[in-house]
Amino acid sequence: MKQTSFFIPLLGTLLLYGCAGTSTEFECNATTSDTCMTMEQANEKAKKLERSSEAKPVAASLPRLAEGNFRTMPVQTVTATTPSGSRPAVTAHPEQKLLAPRPLFTAAREVKTVVPVSSVTPVTPPRPLRTGEQTAALWIAPYIDNQDVYHQPSSVFFVIKPSAWGKPRIN
């Protein structure tokens, strides 16, 4: 028991020592296209870019489309029909006779008459009628913006006519 109580704080100290960093600030692992900066420097850089471009020139031009086949519907193939000259012609020979159709089963059958049962349909109270909303979909093609960011194809749905309660119907 005494040995266990000694090793637990020692083990905890060793674990915390491994997590402790040698510097007070985080190190920057910048790649060739990135630079390290503090949050204040990044905010200042963003403010400068925002001030310099009062009118956004990108909004006037369309972004370039991404490469690839992004069809949502399969390509409809056209089937070729054979010309009428290649079809075999049907010829009737004068010596061939067509047979009249004959019944397959000639046994006597019992005919039953069915008398319909008159029934009164129960009257149900009128039910309220709810019409569903009508929506339209807008497909947005994939594109790459001016900062070379790829945007995937997506769909945006709009409500054209909202749902509403109609006059009750009687069944």
UniProtKB/Swiss-Prot annotation:
Presence of keyword Lipoprotein: yes
Disulfide bonds: none
Signal peptide from the UniProt entry: 1-18
Entry-linked InterPro entries: T4SS_TraV
Gene Ontology, cellular component aspect: cell outer membrane
Lipid linkage positions (N-palmitoyl cysteine): 19
Compartmental location: Cell outer membrane
Principal subcellular localization: membrane
Lipidation (S-diacylglycerol cysteine): 19
Pfam families assigned: TraV
Keyword Signal among record annotations: yes
Keyword set, alphabetical order: Cell outer membrane, Conjugation, Lipoprotein, Membrane, Palmitate, Plasmid, Signal
Membrane topology of the entry: Lipid-anchor
UniProt function note: Involved in F pilus assembly. Appears to facilitate the polymerization of inner membrane-located pilin subunits into extracellular F pilus filaments.
Record-given protein name: Protein TraV
Organism per entry: Escherichia coli (strain K12)
Lineage: Bacteria, Pseudomonadati, Pseudomonadota, Gammaproteobacteria, Enterobacterales
This protein's encoding gene: traV
